[in-house]
Amino acid sequence: MTPADLAELLKATAAAVLTEHDLDVAALPATVTVERPRNPEHGDYATNLALQLGKKVGVNPRELAGWLATALTAADGIAVAEVAGPGFVNLRIEASAQGVIITNVLAAEGSYGSSDQYAGRNVNLEFVSANPTGPIHIGGTRWAAVGDALGRLLATQGAAVTREYYFNDHGAQIDRFVNSLIASAKGEPTPEDGYAGDYIVDIAQQVIAKAPDVLGLPEDQQRETFRAIGVDLMFTHIKQSLHDFGTDFDVYTHEDSMHTSGRVDQAITQLREAGSIYEKDGAVWLRTTDFGDDKDRVVIKSDGNAAYIAGDLAYYLDKRKRGFDLCIYMLGADHHGYIARLKAAAAALGDDPDTVEVLIGQMVNLVRDGQPVRMSKRAGTVITLDDLVEAIGVDAARYALIRSSVDTPIDIDLELWSSASNENPVYYVQYAHARLCALARNAADLGVSVNTDHLDLLTHEKEGALIRNLGEFPRVLKTAASLREPHRVCRYLEDLAGDYHRFYDSCRVLPQGDEEPGDLHSARLALCRATRQVIANGLAILGVSAPERM
C-alpha cells in the first residue's frame, strides 16, 4: 500500500463514515493526505482528517476520529488504526500490504517518482546568464547546479523544459571588458573600472594571436576586433566550464540580438498601443506602477539609449512568442527589484503575471578551518566555478550547492566536502548506492536472486521504515517541483541512506556459511534493489553520479 493508496482508502472510508452518520460528504477536502509521524511509535502514518472535518460537520473531532479508526481497522492492509490526541488517527500497515511499494519501484525503474502534474506545461528556465566578462563566479555556480537540478526535477513531473542562457553581450560591461583587454595587450595598467585577473591577459594574447595586426588598426576597428574575438573566447570558456560541471543549455540567446533585430522596438510599439508607455523628461517610461511595481521604469533614456529593462521586455515577449506558458528566472541576491519589474512587464504586455516566476539566490562562501577562502588568481578576487570543482570535485560541488534552499546563504567547508566520511552528505548517499551495488554482486556470487513473491516476510521494523520511505519518493518529487526546491531531494536521499544503513546493520540480507539461500534473502534483496534504484533516480535529478564502487 503506497501513501497515495492509503490516502484514497482514507477518503473513501471517510465518505462512508459521513454517509453512515447522515453528515455532509461535501465537507471532504478534494485531496486527502497522510503523513509519516516523526515518532515511529505513533504508527507508520497519521492523518488529521477528523480535525479538518469536525467543525464543518458539527461533530467532536475525537469522536469522528474514533469512527474513522473503527472503519479503517476493518479495511484490507490496515493492521492497526488508533485515535490520538484531539482527533488524530495513527495507522500501522500490514507487512503484506507494503510490498507493493517495492514492486512499483522495480517495475518503474528510472521513471519511479515521475508524475504528470505538469504535463502540457511548456517551461522556459533561464539561469546562470552571467556576463561574458569573466569566468563563472561562485554565485553563478550555485545557479548552474540548482537550475539544472530544477530543470531535471520539473521534467520528471511532465513539464517540457527548455534551459536557456541569456548572453549579456550588450551594454557598458562589455565596453569595460574591451578596455581591459586592450590595456593588457598594450602592457598598460588595468583601467580603474576594468576587469583584472590572469584570464584577461590570456584572452588579450589570444586575440593578438588570432588578429596579429589588431593593435595597428584604427581605434573603432581595434575595439570591434577585441570585442568580437574576446567575447567569443570568454563565452567559449564559460560554456566549457558549465559543460564540465554537468550543466548544458538548450538555447543561448544574445541580449544584443534583442536590439539589433528590432525586437526591442517591437515590444515598445506593442506597449505603446496598449497605453502602457509614456514620455517624460525626454525619456520613454513604462507604467509598471499600474501593475504593482514601486515606481515606473525608464525604457529609453533621455540620451536615446535603451535601458536594461528594454531588453528584458523584448526577451520576455520573445519567450512568449516561442510558446512558453511559464518563464522562470533565476537571479542573484542583488536582483530583488526585478521580481516586481518582470511581473509588471508581463502584465503590461497583456499576460498573467503568474507566467513569470523569479527565484532569488543568496550568497555562497568557501571556508577552510572556519576561515574564508580566497583562491582565484586567474579571476582576480573572484572565486570561480573552476576553483570550486578543482577543490572538491563536480559531484560534491553540485550537491553542496543544491542541498540548501536558494534563499539561504551557505558556507561550503572545503575539508568536509572533500572528505570520505559519513559527515560528508554526498559521500554518505553515494556510499549507500555503492554498498547496494556491492551487495548485488555478492548476491550473484552466492546464487541469491531477487524475488518479489514473498515480500510479506519483510516484517522487521527497519525493513518497514525503509519500505515506507521508498514510498515517499513520488510525493517528495511532487512537492519539490511545485515549490521549486530541489534541495528537498538531497535531504530525502540522506534520510533514505540512513534508513538503508540502519536496515543493513539490523537485517542480514545474504546467507552465511553453509546456509542455503531462502525466500527471506530474496525478499530482502528485492528491497535492496528498489532502494538502489530510488537513490540512483534521486542522484540523477541532482546531476550527481551514482558510483557502483567506492
Swiss-Prot record:
SUPFAM superfamilies: Anticodon-binding domain of a subclass of class I aminoacyl-tRNA synthetases (SSF47323), Arginyl-tRNA synthetase (ArgRS), N-terminal 'additional' domain (SSF55190), Nucleotidylyl transferase (SSF52374). It catalyses: tRNA(Arg) + L-arginine + ATP = L-arginyl-tRNA(Arg) + AMP + diphosphate. Its EC number is 6.1.1.19. SMART domains: Arg_tRNA_synt_N, DALR_1. It is an enzyme of class 6 (ligase). A motif ('HIGH' region) lies at residues 130-140. It is found in: Cytoplasm. InterPro entries: aa-tRNA-synth_I_CS, Arg-tRNA-ligase, Arg-tRNA-synth_N, Arg-tRNA-synth_N_sf, ArgRS_core, DALR_anticod-bd, Rossmann-like_a/b/a_fold, tRNAsynth_Ia_anticodon-bd. GO terms for biological process: arginyl-tRNA aminoacylation. Keywords: Aminoacyl-tRNA synthetase, ATP-binding, Cytoplasm, Ligase, Nucleotide-binding, Protein biosynthesis. One of its GO terms (cellular component) is cytoplasm. One of its GO terms (molecular function) is ATP binding. Gene3D superfamilies: Arginyl tRNA synthetase N-terminal domain, HUPs, Isoleucyl-tRNA Synthetase, Domain 1. Belongs to the class-I aminoacyl-tRNA synthetase family. Monomer. This is Arginine--tRNA ligase.
